[in-house]
Amino acid sequence: MDIYDTQTLGVVVFGGFMVVSAIGIFLVSTFSMKETSYEEALANQRKEMAKTHHQKGEKKKKEKTVEKKGKTKKKEEKPNGKIPEHDLDPNVTIILKEPVRVSAVAVAPTSVHSSVGHTPIATVPAMPQEKLASSPKDRKKKEKKVAKVEPAVSSIVNSIQVLASKSAILEATPKEVPMVAVPPVGSKASSPATSSQGKKGQGAQNQAKKGEGAQNQGKKGEGAQNQAKKGEGAQNQAKKGEGAQNQGKKGEGAQNQAKKGEGGQNQAKKGEGAQNQGKKGEGAQNQGKKGEGAQNQAKKGEGAQNQAKKGEGAQNQGKKGEGAQNQSKKGEGAQNQAKKGEGGQNQAKKGEGAQNQAKKGEGAQNQAKKGEGVQNQAKKGVEGAQNQGKKGEANQNQAKKGEGGQNQTKKGEGPQNQGKKGEAAQKQDKKIEGAQNQGKKPEGTSNQGKKGEGAQNQGKKGEGAQNQSKKGEGAQNQAKKGEGGQNQAKKGEGAQNQAKKGEGAQNQAKKGEGVQNQAKKGVEGAQNQGKKGEANQNQAKKGEGGQNQTKKGEGPQNQGKKGEAAQKQDKKIEGAQNQGKKPEGTSNQGKKGEGAQNQGKKGEGAQNQGKKGEGAQNQGKKGEGAQNQGKKGEGAQNQGKKGEGAQNQGKKGEGAQNQGKKGEGPQNQAKKGEGAQNQGKKGEGAQNQGKKGEGAQNQGKKAEGVQSQSKKGEGTQNQGKKGDGNPNQGKKGEGASNQNRKTDTVANQGTKQEGVSNQVKKSEGSPNQGKKAEGAPNQGKKKDGSPSQAKKVDAAANQGKKSEMAPAQGQKASMVQSQEAPKQDAPAKKKSGSRKKGEPGPPDCDGPLFLPYKTLVSTVGSMVFSEGEAQRLIEILSEKTGVIQDTWHKATQKGDPVAILKRQLQEKEKLLATEQEDAAVAKSKLRELNKEMASEKAKAAAGEAKVKKQLVAREQEIAAVQARMQASYRDHVKEVQQLQGKIRTLQEQLENGPNTQLARLQQENSILRDALNQATSQVESKQNTELAKLRQELSKVNKELVEKSEASRQEEQQRKALEAKAATFEKQVLQLQASHKESEEALQKRLEEVTRELCRAQTSHANLRADAEKAQEQQQRVAELHSKLQSSEVEVKSKCEELSSLHGQLKEARAENSQLTERIRSIEALLEAGQAQDTQASHAEANQQQTRLKELESQVSCLEKETSELKEAMEQQKGKNNDLREKNWKAMEALALAERACEEKLRSLTQAKEESEKQLHLAEAQTKETLLALLPGLSISAHQNYAEWLQEFKEKGSELLKKPPTLEPSMDIVLKLREAEETQNSLQAECDQYRTILAETEGMLKDLQKSVEEEERVWKAKVGAAEEELHKSRVTVKHLEDIVEKLKGELESSDQVREHTSHLEAELEKHMAAASAECQNYAKEVAGLRQLLLESQSQLDEAKSEAQKQSDELALVRQQLSDMRSHVEDGDVAGSPAVPPAEQDPMKLKTQLERTEATLEAEQTRRQKLTAEFEEAQRTACRIQEELEKLRAAGPLESSGKEEITQLKERLEKEKRLTSDLGRAAIKLQELLKTTQEQLTKEKDTVKKLQEQLGKAEDGSSSKEGTSV
């Protein structure tokens, strides 16, 4: 029950107030008659109130069991879910004694009795060191202290005191000071059955004690009590008898769980000098002591958390202080987990025998007691639920291993510890580098739960490899549930002990915030989660004489010891076997509580051992998809998960027996009810205990018919006890693999040799471990009729005995024992405490019975025999007496005895054959299993690597969680201080007296009543008017929607009509395409004719070429026309290009004409549909255009002919011109040669002439000189010409000769003159010759000049003729150009016609496309409008529903106001004066009501606007509909195409406008609907706020009434 819930708090406080007021009146009336003090009267009053309050709390707990599961998350934020460690409250009374021998005193609101059995909180045996409050005076003193510490006002005060008491527990542990726990009133504090971990009641057996004779799981000796069997309720969890030995007391005088000697040593004390439970070697540290000051069992490294070590100094499994002491080690001299002291106290026994295994103070909560003292680790309900596996201080550590002192897995005399690997073997929790938790061995040797080298914790399963109880993603320890932080039991933020979950809050298995225990069972008497072994030895303690769960033999390997690299007991290999899945409850060796397998599945059959909340996962449920500890395959059930209601492995139920409930001895370990379900029996008897997935073998599942894991026998051997020297639980032979020994193919945990023998099969013929009764279902009852774990076959057959060939579980190598062999050997093997006293086992049916002769004769005489039976008796007697058998035959015997024997032999042979076939089938299945195991082994290697990585990541997460825990611890301390201050103020108010408060409450109630009356009346009137208006508006809107739906239907009809028109247009287009093809065929014919004409033109062109050859003869004209022809050729080329372009244009014109014809035809076809008269005119025009086109085509053909002729002429002319060119070139070359020759001659002549002239000048000069020399008297000018000079010389010489010479000339001069004359004459002759030559050359030049001139004249004549021809050709070209221009003009006219028609056609196409597009758009818009209308309709419907809801909510508000009124009136009867803060509530309510009225009025106005706009939208829709109808009516009347197009445009524009208007109207409607919806939501919020305020006001009034005591 959550005391912070406002409703429950109000109800409880108000009820308490009424009860206390009545009690107070009664006390006041009787106060004067008795001479008692006021303090005593007040104490008695508070006692009575506490009892009444507690009874109410019990009722509410029973009614709200489901609510507890749902409120787990809320409890994390509240102090009762996680108790912080803070300073002690000054009011808490603590009794301090010696740290070792003094037990704590539980201060409770009820009196503390001296008798141990009647203590309300915790059973504390009488101790010589401590005097309990036995005398009446002492009782009164105690009661006074109680009155001061815990005034029973309400559950708030109790919760705060529990916080203080819990802080005292946490602070006192390091100094070995017992804690004082003050449980809340509602936590069954007064019930005598709420003793510690296993204390049930006077006769309530311990954790595993089930029914009257229901032995505990491991109850071994005659009167040996259960693990937690207290006696009448007195002894500790492990206290067995009067001073019965510890938790593990097994045989008659069996010592404690680990107590091995006469009674001396501690839990781990094995022999005389056996070391402590955790004592490893000579100086071996304690169970959890790792290094010099190493922490306890789970203490990993420097700051490594203990098995349950949670935060900075988080406590060990039992570690309470800052991390100092050993598992149970509390103070400096605190005893070890297996305290060695004088008489070997209990395993965790701290005082002389006082506290329970986890008992911390007298009434201190269990190790895992986390909350206000509410749920134990396995707190079942209220009546007598034991703690989960109350681990605490005395609880042996989950994985207590000790080296020599046999650990949890004590093997034999000196065998290795469960985790003992060598002398210095690491502790069970020794991690090696701080690695694995509880069961880590060395060298990768798997711990109890060790999976691989970096193997995860005890329950670490597969990829998600979380710890045994690892729940979340962040690898918690064995029971680690919470954020991923804590060790084996670390559950919440405050990482307490092994089971310590929250900051000091939940139990070992307490998973959620403070919710149910790990194995929270139910209520009536469900046993603890961790009820494990026979005497619930430490988590795995099994053997007969107190050996551990996996006690192997003298020196067998550890339970999980496989080999050096053997996989851990729980090594699953991705879904493989369970962690410690053993026999008897197949719980893992270390399967403890927190995450323990289904073993502790308590609830009504519901959750698994660790299954916490509604869907909480099992103990082994690991993380994201990790299945439960036993959950192996895809949907495989948990280890003990039975089915829907099937009992779990340890499913207790109301009176269900414990995990190992045998029955009177026979039932299996998990036999729960009538002896029916197997340990692992899941649903209809289907899956084994550990049945994992589809093909996953169970822990003990061997083959299909292999017996179950825990088959015990007649209840004799321990869970793992094999014989004296018998190998341990899974030990089969000397080399037989351990419990989890897989061999090479990783066989199942119990599968040993070929997978057949059971896990626990003991010795040669010893009955199975869990051998139950004659028909008791096996522990792991499979299917297919295969014998179950406990299947007996006449209660005798071996566990695994399938046939003569199937090796039994204990069958060692190839020994194949017959079915009867174990039956004979069984009694000899079971003598050492095999049967429990008063528990007869099932009879050995085949064993010899020794009866007296008289009784035999009497029985035989009284029996009636058949003939066959009588014959058999005769045979037996004849064999005894030696009489021949034939003499005893009857004369009337029907058959021959030999024939009968033959028949029997045949029947036996048949049975043998069937058994052999079954054996062959089993062998084949074993081979398949071996293959599967090989594949699983490979998967396991990958899984281990992943798990190692996850461990590293999760260690980091643990560090982060520790930091968070420290912060949350500080916050909790602050909250506790604040709550203590509030408690003081409440106490002060209580002391002031109830009268003033009652008066105030009466005034307040009257004010509230008036305000509520006014508010309800106003709200009702306004809501009624608003609802009426809303209904009217909704009816209007509905009508409008109907009208709009009709309009949309009409629009759909119009759209269909438009679609029909579009179909007709498509047909017309197809017709036009056909006509277009016909016109193309006609054009092709025309082109063929043109090609023929071109051929003719080519022939004429050839003729012209012949004429051109004749013209080549005129070579003289070629020279003249040469230059002009080039220009003419250029022009001709340009003309040719123009002609080619004209040709192309003509072709285009033809194509366009054809297109025009086609378009005209299409236009005609279109016009014919609507215009009957215009069709005839258009046909005539078309015919005229066709005739015109034909004429144009004929003209074009003529032009083409002319152009072809011109081309031929031009080509002929070109040929002639080419010939003339060639001749001209030849003539030019000849002329050039002649000119060159003449020039050379002229050059040579000019040179000769120059030379001759030079010689003449020289000769003349010489003659002049000589003549002047002869005739010096002559004076002649030298500048004269030579001829003139000679003439003058002749004249002057003759004159001189005529004169008488004065001197006679000499002969020399005369000779010289003669020589000069001769030379002159010779020179003159040469000059004459030169002159003649010059004259000849000049003549020749003149002749050449004349010839050249003549040739030039010839060329000029030719050029003139060519020019004339060119002129003629130009004239013809001009004529052709004129013709072409005319054709162009005609073509342009046709082009204009064509363009006009194409323009018309394009416009028609555009209009058609636009019309079709607009039709489509219109259809889309109509569809959108329809959708908008539908949406508006749906929104209006929603508005209606919301209005209805609002009206309902208003009615609820009215009802609540009336209830408040009546409640306030009721409060006036016993009320007090009003409190000033409550007077403000009616004013607030009035103001809020006024606001709601204003909002309702605004909403009404908005709704009116909405209706108006909706009407406008409806009108626009009607207009659109009318216009569409008009368009439909006007459609067929229109005639002309152009008018139709314009009208279509207008219509489409109108339709667009109308659709846009409709869209706007729809948008407005949507906006208005949104606004109305927002207003409705606002009104809802206001109504909710009003309701909340009313509820708060009601709660406040009730709380004030309750506090005014």
Curated annotation (Swiss-Prot):
Residue spans of biased composition, Polar residues class: 224-258, 274-338, 354-378, 385-399, 435-479, 495-519, 526-540, 576-720, 736-769, 811-821
Entry keyword set: Acetylation, Endoplasmic reticulum, Isopeptide bond, Membrane, Phosphoprotein, Protein transport, Repeat, Translocation, Transmembrane, Transmembrane helix, Transport, Ubl conjugation
Biased composition (Basic residues): 52-63
Repeat positions for Sequence: 196-205, 206-215, 216-225, 226-235, 236-245, 246-255, 256-265, 266-275, 276-285, 286-295, 296-305, 306-315, 316-325, 326-335, 336-345, 346-355, 356-365, 366-375, 376-385, 386-395, 396-405, 406-415, 416-425, 426-435, 436-445, 446-455, 456-465, 466-475, 476-485, 486-495, 496-505, 506-515, 516-525, 527-536, 537-546, 547-556, 557-566, 567-576, 577-586, 587-596, 597-606, 607-616, 617-626, 628-637, 638-647, 648-657, 658-667, 668-677, 678-687, 688-697, 698-707, 708-717, 718-727, 729-738, 739-748, 749-758, 759-768, 769-778, 779-788, 789-798, 799-808
Annotated crosslink Glycyl lysine isopeptide (Lys-Gly) (interchain with G-Cter in SUMO1) location: K823
GO biological process terms, semicolon-separated: protein transport; signal transduction
Subcellular locations according to the entry: Endoplasmic reticulum membrane
Annotated region described as 61 X 10 AA tandem repeats of [NSQ]-[NKQVGA]-[GSAQKRT]-[ASGDTK]-[KGTQSAV]-[KGAED]-[EQVGIPTDMA]-[EGVAS]-[AGVPETNS]-[AQNGPTVS], given as residue ranges: 196-808
Positions carrying Phosphoserine: S111, S159, S165, S786, S818, S1162, S1178
Extent of Basic and acidic residues compositional bias: 64-88, 420-433, 561-574, 1576-1598
Any one Gene Ontology cellular component term annotated for this protein: endoplasmic reticulum membrane
Tissue: Widely expressed.
Residue ranges of the region described as Disordered: 44-88, 114-150, 172-849, 1460-1481, 1571-1605
UniProt topology in membrane: Single-pass type III membrane protein
All ranges on the Lumenal side of the membrane: 1-7
Residues in the Cytoplasmic compartment per record: 29-1605
Chloroplast in keyword set: no
Post-translational modification N6-acetyllysine, affected residues: K1135
Covalent cross-link site, Glycyl lysine isopeptide (Lys-Gly) (interchain with G-Cter in SUMO2): K148
Biased composition (Low complexity): 197-208
Regions that span the bilayer: 8-28
Function: Acts as a ribosome receptor and mediates interaction between the ribosome and the endoplasmic reticulum membrane.
PANTHER family xref list: RIBOSOME BINDING PROTEIN-1 (PTHR18939), RIBOSOME-BINDING PROTEIN 1 (PTHR18939:SF4)
Name of the protein this chain belongs to: Ribosome-binding protein 1
Gene: Rrbp1
